[in-house]
Amino acid sequence: YFIPDSVPAYQENDIMMAVSYLDRLARERDMPLVICIALGSNMGNRGKDGQLATYLDIVSRRRKRCSVAAVGNEANARHHFLGKIQPDMEYESVEVSVEENMPGFFIEMWANAPELYAVSVSSPTGEVLPKVPYRSGGRQEFVFIFEQTRVSIDYRLTGRRQGNQLIYLRFSNAAQGIWTINVYPQSIVTGDYNMWLPMRNFTSGNVFFLRSNPNHTITVPGNAGQVISTGGYNVANGGLYLDSG
């Protein structure tokens, strides 16, 4: 995931295990429990089908239980892209700016079922990875000769009930410049999809979408249905903290 070694990061299942331990301990002692999760991520399913969000919802519905999570500081990070493909469009281009050479980064593209998409990638020098045909569980790697950047593309169907599509794009030895991802509709109803880059702390350089969208930037698990999500504010003037949420 190219997360810098100096940044603390935890697996989702480890957080779930910690919540389970606290819930069990509170039940044994017959005590109320407030779970504060001062962590967040741009990764994973943003819907109600995400594993951590689902588990927190289950725990929070129990008597004497409450879960609180931060909404994150991604509002102005330009790490979210909202796509919309019209019926007459062959594809939509998504431009990603990499401001300096970096070890790598990744992008998660999510689409709600029954939407299905395929992608191609163009490098800053114009070299093209042709459209990778959609195949669930399929993976393809390509090395751009001039940039020496390795790009891998994974197609997955996720979730226990919904079967939403996830396209995972991984850029290793990412070269500076504008990278273009072309999104091709395979089966669409609304034509809507979302892309997310990692959180600021999870990248070792500045990378962002040129046509970013400021909505849907609350970090997981702050988007869970039964979790109280908290944002920041400016203590000097009482206004909202611009990066919050």
Residue positions per predicted region:
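Loop-rich non-cytosolic ectodomains and luminal regions
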Residues: 1-245
